[in-house]
């Protein structure tokens, strides 16, 4: 089966049964929270034999708890081929191509500035309560424990469409430049289950996150969600993801298409206004969603907002200069 621990951190920790052990897909933001999530699972299932850890993408809330999930000494040798890594009996760590490069770029090169700004965005230092910190739309908030990183032992590229991990087949879909520069969805045929990483989240996401990061490509984001729908929807019973809750059955197709549609709409409408000569601030004030998207509860503006996403698209194509020489 597939099990998720939600509410322990900003993201979910997902535990997937293999023939003789477990895959952990995303390991939360900090070591302590991941230890607690793993302990919850072990209280129910006994000691977990972790065959593989998968990082869905290069944001810290998905890899920072690595040392709470596994011991560094139990990690497979990255110099070995992937087949030999699995055969070694050690834990294999998988991530999308470019993961380490972008994890370092975001969390080392700009890490100090970004961490400071994240405190403002998420209200990390606020007291919990109705007049302080509640949640942040995609999860409970930013945790403040020990952030760790264990480098992937193998990065998934386009030349690796699928792997079998301890008897469980996993089919990958790379989605670079969407919610993160390096990201991947995954499909589990045995469970008829589609993992959408952070490409679908039960809320409108950020095309530009206010903590600071590279602007995301709304057009590609929509494209990859539609591709996932076309490749996997007809053989999927459940869609699950790294934030918020799963979706089942007949609602899956609509869920994927509505999520793709909102990013495509914001992208195209912003370009339309840009080419008419409006500035970034003017577009942010003008743009509005059609009723069909406005009324969809899982694409509401609980995390990202329409105005700052429109500004993100303007920035991506035209940059900060408003072309006013005065």
Language-model regions: role of each:
Residues 25-27, 51-61, 94-97, 175, ...:
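Active-site neighborhood of phospho(di)ester-bond hydrolases with catalytic His/Asp-centered motifs
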